């Protein structure tokens, strides 16, 4: 009876101090959706009253929200967005991209165009904002990958905010909030790790510029609309600096050095899914005595949209390794899969229970695009990784993990050559005591990370918003824009070059102009 009273009293205290929380969750990229949904579900399970804006870009991505959520307000996808995404061009573009500032900028411009079309649709055709203006929220949570949330929260009067990121810090966040040094911070889009050499800084600034351009091009279209319909006056940067907390989907065991603000927290592991029992089909598959390699490139750049030459090269390489069983996530049945039905060491699957397979201790190597969630899942399960980074943060994720001695990298360009694939897979499967030691270490660090991340999220949020005026980033120093620093570097180089030419010409004129050589012979 006493225990029942204590439980009742605890529940009363929790619900009595529950917050009204608004979470903006654009349903576009699976990893982003799941990370944000996990935060919503954890807070709702705690007893807080959580309302979620489910801004739907794609119906083939589930919103992952639990029944504990108080209310889900859905926004239908824009017809233009649906048309663009149904062309299937995005995965093809991602597969054909290169790790250069120019190409990553182009990719982000394409994604930014999709986001601003959906935001325009939301502002002009949805009743969402007027409805939200009638509700009082204590604070809101959003991921700034989609800039629409910044404007929505401001026009409905929510100025206490939490910024979350399903990857490491989005470049726009540390730069705008003043918690990093623009010149020395590797961009999320870059292929750099923890440090930048002197000669890498300018190229890195171009990556930073590309990422900021992704947000600026969204802002250039949607800010005037927010101003037109709802009288928004504040610039996006000023609104972002009202944030009180930052949460990142990273873990110190696999991440690199970063400059941190006082209110920045790592909650890598919070998105781990609970392990389920494998079906009899997969149990039978995993009983095969051969080494088993799981191949999955995520939900954005799907295997079925891989360029044909890369598919053929992968297939050729796999066939050369008959003693290895490959389980390949390939999202559709097509001529490519049908012509390989008789291949005995390759299994195609439209869907894979990735978490459960990795946790089975039967997977010897995971070939992955190196998305943050996939990488952390593999480390948590103690599975070796062969990374094939394709776009966005994947190149940097791979570089950081490689620096920490946790993975091997197969550059996408090497997939064109079957011999290089064979060599990389064999290297990934052969004994490597140092690699195994590092993986055991990171796996042990991640063992309780889900519970720890949930507790950190809850305790930090509840402590922060127990005060009426929690501190924000409005007083932090402002950083220079990457483009400004690029111009400064280029101007400095040009000035040094001009000074060199001036000194050289001046030296030449003084020493050689008008100089008369002595005669080397005499006349008689």
Swiss-Prot record:
Residues 1-20 form the signal peptide. Glycans are attached at residues 125, 277, 335. Belongs to the UDP-glycosyltransferase family. The chain crosses the membrane at residues 488-508. It catalyses: glucuronate acceptor + UDP-alpha-D-glucuronate = acceptor beta-D-glucuronoside + UDP + H(+). Keywords: Glycoprotein, Glycosyltransferase, Membrane, Signal, Transferase, Transmembrane, Transmembrane helix. One of its GO terms (molecular function) is glucuronosyltransferase activity. The keyword Signal applies. Pfam families: UDPGT. Its EC number is 2.4.1.17. Its main location: membrane. SUPFAM superfamilies: UDP-Glycosyltransferase/glycogen phosphorylase. It is an enzyme of class 2 (transferase). GO terms for cellular component: membrane. It is found in: Membrane. InterPro entries: UDP-glycosyltransferase (IPR050271), UDP_glucos_trans (IPR002213), UDP_glycos_trans_CS (IPR035595). It is a single-pass membrane protein. This is Putative UDP-glucuronosyltransferase ugt-56. The lineage of its organism: Eukaryota, Metazoa, Ecdysozoa, Nematoda, Chromadorea. The keyword Oxidoreductase does not apply.
